[in-house]
Amino acid sequence: MEVIICSDEQAVGRIAADRIAKVLGRAKAPVLGVATGSTPLTTYSSLAALAAEGKADFTDLRAFALDEYIGLPADDERSYAATIRHTVTEQLGLDPANVHTPDGMADDLDAACAAYETAIQEADGVDVQILGIGANGHIGFNEPTSSLSSRTRVKTLAERTKADNARFFEEGEKVPSHCVTQGLGTIMDARNVVLLAIGANKADALAGAVEGPVSAMCPASVLQFHPHVLVIADDAAASKLTMAEYFRWTDSQRGDLSGAM
């Protein structure tokens, strides 16, 4: 893993966007894996700024979302399809036909999950997968005890995850209990992964993912087995990393060198 610790959320987004754009720029038919939530928002706005400045071209970019609530249609503003439409498709000027989200309204959810896996494979896989991390260590909606080799499937959300996501719903609205999510095995198939962490409430989870044992109790820890992972965190999220000073030192000594990202 390469770990970069930043002073604030804006710096996280700028650095992530720069590294992501470089990888996508090298790909013949670029594919980006996109996440929802508040964490990647500065990354998306920074990617849009790079495009506006002529430093990146996303004309032919294809995108696959990590997950979707079951029971919310794509035109429901609370759905992840709507979130991705606003934060990614419109902001980056993508062709809506090139942006895919899991189908949480399918009559046959198992078939829809299999079809989503096939669509990713037919796109020749994901060049860069953007991830946030939940306070309980989940990535996508892979909650603790998820199989480390899991594929796209239906999952039940943990109560903590529902409570964390309640801020995206109006007061009194019920947060869905079920979702379709890419599995940990699906995520691990991406050629590069960028894990973003912002805020002190993510500190324990990030420490477990980066420095803890690989365990289904911290799903993000499976990323320790991935050959090309870039972790970008702000000071607060990195506050419980025992190797934080080492990560800062290596970053200061890197110069023009970097990993696959």
From Swiss-Prot:
Reading the lineage from the top rank, the first entry is Bacteria
**Gene3D superfamilies reported in the protein's UniProt record:** 3.40.50.1360
UniProt lists the family membership as follows:
Belongs to the glucosamine/galactosamine-6-phosphate isomerase family. NagB subfamily.
What is the species of this protein? Answer: Cutibacterium acnes (strain DSM 16379 / KPA171202)
Gene for this chain: nagB
Q: Does the keyword Hydrolase apply?
A: yes
Q: Which GO terms describe its biological process?
A: carbohydrate metabolic process; glucosamine catabolic process; N-acetylglucosamine catabolic process; N-acetylneuraminate catabolic process
A GO MF annotation of the entry reads:
glucosamine-6-phosphate deaminase activity
Identify one Pfam family in the record: Glucosamine_iso
Q: Which CDD domains match?
A: GlcN6P_deaminase
**What S-S linkages are listed for this chain?**
none
UniProt cross-references to NCBIfam families, sorted A to Z: nagB, PRK00443.1-4
Q: Its catalytic activity?
A: alpha-D-glucosamine 6-phosphate + H2O = beta-D-fructose 6-phosphate + NH4(+)
Quote the function comment for this protein. Answer: Catalyzes the reversible isomerization-deamination of glucosamine 6-phosphate (GlcN6P) to form fructose 6-phosphate (Fru6P) and ammonium ion.
* Top-level class of the enzyme under EC nomenclature: hydrolase
UniProt pathway = Amino-sugar metabolism; N-acetylneuraminate degradation; D-fructose 6-phosphate from N-acetylneuraminate: step 5/5
Q: What is its EC number?
A: 3.5.99.6
Its recorded name reads Glucosamine-6-phosphate deaminase
Oxidoreductase keyword on record: no
Q: What is any one of the record's Gene Ontology cellular component terms? A: cytoplasm
Give the UniProt keywords, A-Z.
Carbohydrate metabolism, Hydrolase
Active-site residues annotated for this sequence: D67, N136, H138, E143
